[in-house]
Amino acid sequence: MKCPFCGFADTRVIDSRLGKEGNNIRRRRECSQCERRFTTFERVEDMLPLIIKKDARRQPFDRKKVIGGIQRACEKRPVSIATIEKIVDTLERQLQESGEREIESKIIGQAVMDALHDLDQVAYVRFASVYRQFKDINEFMAELKDILAEGGNVRDN
């Protein structure tokens, strides 16, 4: 592997460890020329399906894009980045286990909405408003009424 510091092509592995969840390997390497050390990670390439967009375009699943959408919905809410990453990890696992080569974007959007619905109702409504493209306040109100009918609560601040 090429050294990130000097660009020399010969490095040696000085330590290898299995990652916490057993799905990656952490390696400490040392450059044979400059003798500096660096870390690399190895993991099995995910075989995620292509995403079919509303306009029928196909594109690879983009974990960062999904995390970004959830983060925007959870902005200023008590939801940690670790929780958001768990949602996306679960989604990726479901996509892999489905065995599908292509999947519609609406299935991903619905899975995120389901996860947010159970996690944080404000984040859920924010995400739903973008995902479902609410046009006016009446659509917001209809969604809020559904949440309240399911046993959600509104508290006074």
UniProtKB/Swiss-Prot annotation:
Q: Where are the zinc fingers (unnamed)?
A: 3-34
Q: Which PANTHER family match?
A: TRANSCRIPTIONAL REPRESSOR NRDR
Q: How is the cofactor bound?
A: Binds 1 zinc ion.
Q: Which cofactor does it need?
A: Zn(2+)
Protein name per its UniProtKB record? Transcriptional repressor NrdR
InterPro entries named among the record's database cross-references: ATP-cone_dom (IPR005144), NrdR-like_N (IPR055173), RNR_NrdR-like (IPR003796)
Q: Any idea which UniProt keywords this protein has?
A: ATP-binding, DNA-binding, Metal-binding, Nucleotide-binding, Repressor, Transcription, Transcription regulation, Zinc, Zinc-finger
Single GO MF descriptor: DNA binding
Task: Spell out the family assignment given in the record's similarity comment.
Answer: Belongs to the NrdR family.
Q: According to the UniProt entry, where is the signal peptide?
A: none
Q: Which stretches make up the ATP-cone domain?
A: 49-139
Gene name, Swiss-Prot/TrEMBL? nrdR
